Curated annotation (Swiss-Prot):
It comes from Francisella philomiragia subsp. philomiragia (strain ATCC 25017 / CCUG 19701 / FSC 153 / O#319-036). Part of a large, functionally divergent protein family. Protein modeling and substrate docking was used to predict the substrate specificity, prior to biochemical analysis. Pfam families: MR_MLE_C, MR_MLE_N. The lineage of its organism: Bacteria, Pseudomonadati, Pseudomonadota, Gammaproteobacteria, Thiotrichales. Substrate binds at residues 25, 136, 161-163, 193, 268, 296-298, 320-322. It comes from the Bacteria. One of its GO terms (molecular function) is racemase and epimerase activity. This is L-amino acid-D/L-Glu epimerase. Catalyzes the epimerization of dipeptides with L-Glu in the second position. Has epimerase activity with L-Ala-L-Glu, L-Pro-L-Glu, L-Val-L-Glu, L-Thr-L-Glu and L-Met-L-Glu (in vitro).
Amino acid sequence: MSKIIDIKTSIIKIPLKRTFITAVRSTNHIDSLAVELTLDNGVKGYGVAPATTAITGDTLQGMQYIIREIFAPVILGSDLSDYKQTLELAFKKVMFNSAAKMAIDLAYHDLLAKEQDISVAKLLGAKANSIVTDVSISCGNVAETIQNIQNGVEANFTAIKVKTGADFNRDIQLLKALDNEFSKNIKFRFDANQGWNLAQTKQFIEEINKYSLNVEIIEQPVKYYDIKAMAEITKFSNIPVVADESVFDAKDAERVIDEQACNMINIKLAKTGGILEAQKIKKLADSAGISCMVGCMMESPAGILATASFALAEDITVADLDPLDWVAKDLYSDYITFNEPNIILKDNLKGFGFNL
């Protein structure tokens, strides 16, 4: 196969329609780094990853440095057919930096698919071309949250991810306000983003059970490193508990599985460093009988396309890929149709189907 002869990076900033607020950060735009890999036959592959410093530690400048100074010397001149070995060698040279790894990993997959004249989704083995996403509701006061949930329901979303963890009293009050407000057909996913402690999480679960809400999952209630508390919550809860920030890579997945510290793992490519590591996590989870969902950072439509492609290939049906609802449709209309809540990949894509 062809050899990689050039690597370029560029910064992409995308404005949001509204401010995104969680227990750990607030933002009104998306910062991303794009990577362009060029083969000696002229074919170019693209990957885009978000700089979500509060979660992964990545910064735009740091990602550029890692790619230019650490990854490029390994990648340049390598044969595309040796991509697994090349990426393993490159990624071993630096700890963490998962977003920088994601951008490179995705650019490789874009090249691999283009060389076969197929989409990345088909390269990975996907049969379907659409997946249903929830919509995320930012942290805010109870009245604002209820209104934003109503807006989501009116936009045809049937799964609502409610950000919690910033103010526990508000979170408890919200449950009472939600009771009987929405149809049982609406599934709620509560994501604390590590904002609670063990006692608060147990109290929140007990409060849920007082009401008639259709609660599908509780996501990452406590600090990412508190696996003991995650295990105790999983044992205590009658609602599935999701590990998000606790699982970045396959080693993390092994730990939470061994400790029985979750019922489900949220796979995000910006945490795993791309598709190859995500596949390892999914395989481990399958072997242990643990479910998986896919999620994302507040990231570009290009990143959502990559995650949707992975999810479709792995038959993952629980998805939190709603940044498409936060940005202008013309940013992704060439490769995705978004009929809320359905994300539909366009037919006849080559690679991911986007150019930068």
